[in-house]
Amino acid sequence: AAAPKPATAAPAAATAAKPAAATQATGSKAAAINFALSKVGQAYVYGGSSDGGWDCSGLTQAAYRQAGVSLPRVAADQADTTTRVSLDSLQPGDLLFWSNNGSNSGVYHVALYVGDGKYVEAANPRAGVRVETIADYAPDFAGRI
């Protein structure tokens, strides 16, 4: 009788660990993540907010717009609309911010956390929209919608 319990428990645990990061997010956050991931490979254009080219805050604004959430256009203003969370407690859908002074007023870049230590960003003209890892280019702080 003891053998079936571990056999039953193991597949359940394996199944629970399999979903992709976007499916772990719920509701609008999953929609925002899926939208942003669908833009990977597209061009970066300063001030861009469409399939013709994205900049960092244009991408995050559009992703959340598709999810029914209104965000300001500028990265620093987006930081103002979030509640700060620890980088150790990130959840898919959180916004990641890079700042030259550690505060919202110094924010110069924003990306969307997708889970598993990864985020999607409109990086720069050379890289375009891509998935990057926190280990390779860590943000200064994060905010939750």
Please provide the spans of the model-predicted regions.
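Peptidoglycan cell-wall recognition and remodeling modules
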Residues: 21-145
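N-terminal low-complexity, Pro/Thr-rich disordered segments
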Residues: 1-31
